[in-house]
Regions:
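Short, flexible turn/loop "capping" segments at secondary-structure junctions
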Residues: 1, 67-72
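N-terminal beta-strand motif that seeds the catalytic metal site of vicinal oxygen chelate
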Residues: 1-19, 76-79, 130-133
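Core segments of cupin and vicinal oxygen chelate
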Residues: 8-56
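Membrane-topology and secretion signals of cell-surface/extracellular proteins
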Residues: 24, 68-69, 131-132
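Vicinal oxygen chelate
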Residues: 31-33, 40, 88-133
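Acetyl-CoA-dependent GNAT
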Residues: 53-58, 130-132
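A short, acidic/glycine-rich surface segment
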Residues: 58-64
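Mid-chain, well-packed structural core segment of small domains
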Residues: 76-92
Length: 133
């Protein structure tokens, strides 16, 4: 039976990617997976694991080429935030850390407030506050 889901992503520069994700508030725990060619990131209160791998290592693991994130989208990761203010704060942190906010914070479908960004390697993320009242 599956116990956890790990998301694996290729990155061009591990050090830069670690700095980016740490500066926007994602946790980089002490782990043997943190090396010169890989990094472990924990996201959310349930601690979803994202593994970052240097591009050449990732290609070796997957035995496949990489998606060009400048011309296509491989996947979009969505996560919830606690308030509209948290959405706005994270959007600012992403900009300050060098990420690309391609959808500014805005109301979505009348009950959500969110924004979307791409990280330093073009992977797409969507931060949402959902007012379920």
């Amino acid at each position: 039976m599956t116990k956890e889901l790990w998301i694996n992503l290729p990155v061009e520069n591990i050090s830069r990617s670690k700095e980016f994700f740490e500066s926007i508030g994602f946790e980089l725990p002490n782990s043997p997976g943190n090396t010169d060619s890989s990094a472990v990131i924990k996201v959310g209160t349930k601690g979803i694991t994202i593994m970052l791998f240097q591009e050449e290592i990732f290609k070796g693991i997957t035995r496949n080429g990489l998606t060009d994130t400048n011309t296509g989208t491989e996947v979009m990761f969505s996560f919830d935030l606690g308030s509209r203010e948290e959405v706005n704060e994270l959007a600012k942190k992403v900009k300050d850390a060098g990420g690309n906010v391609f959808a500014q914070p805005a109301d979505v479908q009348g009950w959500m407030y969110g924004f979307a960004f791409s990280d330093l390697d073009g992977h797409r993320w969507n931060g949402l506050y959902m007012d379920k009242s």
